A protein has these predicted regions:
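Structural stabilizers in ordered domains
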Residues: 1-214
């Protein structure tokens, strides 16, 4: 279902998505991302940030190239030695892994943005950084570069937001395939997963026919 939405995109220059569903456009932008996730979408800071903690030594221990954030392969290698680390270093390691897998949804050789990775080493910076905007921009870039091959495709980023967006935006999809596990949660946590081979076009066509349309 999500692929049907992504393949129906309008070509626009802005950092947002517009998709055609049943002949009508629906929008996926920064505000929609915030509504679904509840994450901070303030502007990304432009000033240089340097944490007091010696992050360079930590990255060097993980064999991360100078001036870059770690990738998942490097973090996996760190699993071998992290058990012997002090609590603070294990916490840094865990947060970096969370960013790589949970927030940015990176492939194994893709790196956490350097400016984002450095925030892990400062508690206040970690709490106040606009993770929502950073995650949204990474997701949109990945989607705009999408080139499906056959019936397969790979999208990086916080992709579960797209499923929640489809359920929140298209009532027919939510009614047919949505599994609302907690109506009081934010949309990202409200819907359980499901799989189907139906396309959005076929579902909407069936709905129109069932309601007396043509």
């Amino acid at each position: 279902r999500t692929l049907s939405l992504l393949c129906g995109q309008l070509r626009i220059p802005k950092k947002e998505l517009w998709c055609i569903v049943a002949g009508k456009p629906i929008r996926f932008g920064l505000n929609e991302f915030h509504h679904i996730t509840g994450l901070n979408i303030d502007d990304l800071p432009t000033e240089k940030f340097e944490p007091e903690a010696d992050y360079k030594a930590f990255f060097s221990e993980l064999r991360v190239p100078t001036g870059e954030g770690p990738n998942l392969d490097e973090l996996r290698q760190g699993l071998v030695t992290c058990r012997a680390w002090p609590t603070e270093k294990r916490r840094w390691f865990g947060l970096l892994t969370l960013l790589s897998i949970g927030l940015f949804g990176l492939h194994t050789n893709s790196r956490i943005p350097f400016e984002s990775a450095k925030r892990v080493f400062d508690d206040e910076a970690m709490k106040t950084y606009p993770w929502g905007r950073a995650a949204y921009e990474a997701l949109v870039v990945s989607i705009k570069l999408l080139r499906p091959i056959g019936k397969t495709y790979t999208v990086g980023g916080l992709v579960f937001v797209l499923q929640a967006w489809a359920y929140e935006s298209i009532i027919t999809i939510a009614e047919r395939f949505g599994n609302a596990v907690n109506a009081d949660e934010i949309p990202l946590l409200r819907w359980g997963g499901s799989r189907t081979r139906s396309t959005i076009e076929s579902v909407i066509a069936e709905d129109i026919k069932a309601n007396g349309g043509e």
